[in-house]
Design a protein with these regions (language model features):
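N-terminal glycine-rich phosphate-binding loop and ensuing alpha1 helix
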Residues: 2-60
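Residue-level signal for inorganic ion chemistry
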Residues: 33, 99, 207
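Conserved beta-loop-beta/alpha segment of the NTase-like Rossmann-fold superfamily
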Residues: 61-129
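A feature for the membrane-embedded catalytic helix bundles of lipid/isoprenoid biosynthetic enzymes
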Residues: 125-134, 138-198, 272-400
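Alpha-helical transmembrane segments of multipass membrane proteins
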Residues: 200, 220-224, 366-367
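Membrane-embedded alpha-helical segments that form the functional core of polytopic membrane enzymes
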Residues: 208-264
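Hydrophobic residues within alpha-helical transmembrane segments
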Residues: 217, 239, 243, 268-271, ...
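Basic, amphipathic juxtamembrane/active-site segments
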Residues: 239, 243, 252-295
Length: 400
């Protein structure tokens, strides 16, 4: 693995008439140069050398103090015209063309290699990313046929020096903000909406944790509406609950876009999700009782809450003591492992998994609430929270 990157940020074309240097061109809420630096830091690069022209050098040097106090950045060295620093470079370093943006997995792959190579597109044209040595003149990417690596189509790279390419580059970056565990409803309904909102919010100084708190407020509001016990409020509760499900993606998208992900943020998001569910179940229990005057529905709601808390204790207790994760997505990832798929219950659990994804049940519960059927929601939730502890306990016993 390499720990040094050389990023070429030198102006090659006629400067544009804008007030800011091109290296500070905003791209999904971050200046281009900062996006490069945070991207390489995320994959393990500890030191970055920026090669720039005279027009960019002064502006970049003015940022050094701020970057040095932000853990999202590597140690940064700036080299203007006439600077000779080749002698201090390690034997191998990551060489990047700063006028391009790259798919995160391309950088991960590059950082893990120790051999001399260059990434090329399907036409065998260099894309401006590879591993070099001080033996090569800076700005000249090593082209050795046996070490050309053709990138897959989904691994995007795009020149953003040209203004007409930036919108396309932003769309490509937004796609990487999705999660691999997204369900069908999330991919086709929730994410398109949340990404459209995130695209605008990233341009403001809004911390992801603030979005999480706002989402929690919506979740609690859905419970308050449901507890009113009228058809109109029950319908509003379902709509607000699903809206909270859509907004639940915003905090993570903004955090990933601005490299602000943290374990604290993950736990806050997790707690927000569960409090939203508790508020909604509680509201449904009260609202269903008011709508039907049925004590049976009331006690079914109480039993649902009991088993829901039991499920939380089991799942989060395991996360806190047996894993480094703070999200229930950990269990979704475990289901995909080859070891888990060998188990007898694996087909059933794999089949049921989409039903416990928030994007799907949030949509279904919204429809049921709009139809004035809160008791059906309670029955569905009760079935889920009774089955989950049984399957999870069985899984733990077999693991031990």
């Amino acid at each position: 693995m390499v720990d040094t990157a050389v990023i070429l940020m030198k102006q090659e074309e006629t400067p544009s008439p804008v007030d800011i240097p091109w290296v500070f061109t905003p791209l999904i809420g971050l200046p281009l140069v900062e996006r490069h630096l945070m991207s390489v830091r995320r994959v393990g690069i500890e030191t970055a050398h920026l090669i720039c022209g005279k027009s960019e050098q002064t502006c970049l040097e003015g940022c050094l103090s701020r970057w040095s106090h932000d853990e999202r950045f590597p140690a940064v060295n700036i080299h203007g015209p006439g600077t000779n620093f080749v002698s201090i470079l390690p034997e191998c370093f990551l060489l990047m063309d700063g006028s391009h943006v790259y798919h995160p997995k391309l950088l991960e792959d590059a950082q893990l290699r120790n051999d001399l190579f260059i990434f090329t597109n399907t036409d065998k044209q260099p894309i401006g990313l590879g591993m070099s040595t001080p033996a090569f003149p800076l700005g000249h990417f090593p082209v050795i046929p046996s070490e050309d690596i053709v990138i897959r189509e989904e691994m995007y790279t795009m020149n953003v020096h040209k203004a007409e390419n930036r919108k396309s580059a932003e769309r490509l970056i937004l796609k990487t903000l999705r999660k691999e565990t997204d369900g069908w409803f999330s991919i086709h309904l929730n994410r398109p909406i949340s990404l459209a909102v995130s695209r605008h919010l990233v341009n403001y100084s809004i911390h992801p944790n603030l979005i999480t708190v706002m989402t929690l407020f919506l979740g609690v509001l859905s419970g308050v509406f449901a507890a009113m016990g009228t058809y109109a409020f029950m319908a509003a509760a379902g709509i607000v609950f699903h809206l909270a499900s859509i907004m639940d993606g915003l905090d993570g998208e903004i955090a990933r876009a601005k490299f602000l992900t943290s374990r604290t943020g993950e736990w806050l998001d997790t707690i927000s999700d569960e409090l939203t569910n508790v508020a909604f179940i509680t509201g449904l229990t009260i609202g269903a009782y008011r709508m039907s005057a049925s004590k049976t529905m009331f006690w079914l709601g109480i039993v649902t809450l009991f088993f829901y808390f039991l499920t939380l204790i089991l799942l989060y207790g395991h996360l806190a003591t047996g894993t480094q994760s703070s999200s229930l997505l950990y269990f979704q990832e475990q289901i995909k492992t080859r070891q888990f798929q060998k188990r007898r219950a694996a087909p059933l659990i794999t089949f049921l998994q989409p039903l416990v994804k928030r994007d799907l049940y949030g949509f279904i519960f919204m429809i049921l609430a709009v139809l004035g059927l809160p008791h059906i929601i309670i029955f569905c939730w009760l079935a889920a929270v009774v089955i989950t502890p049984i399957l999870f306990t069985s899984h733990l016993l077999k693991s031990n």
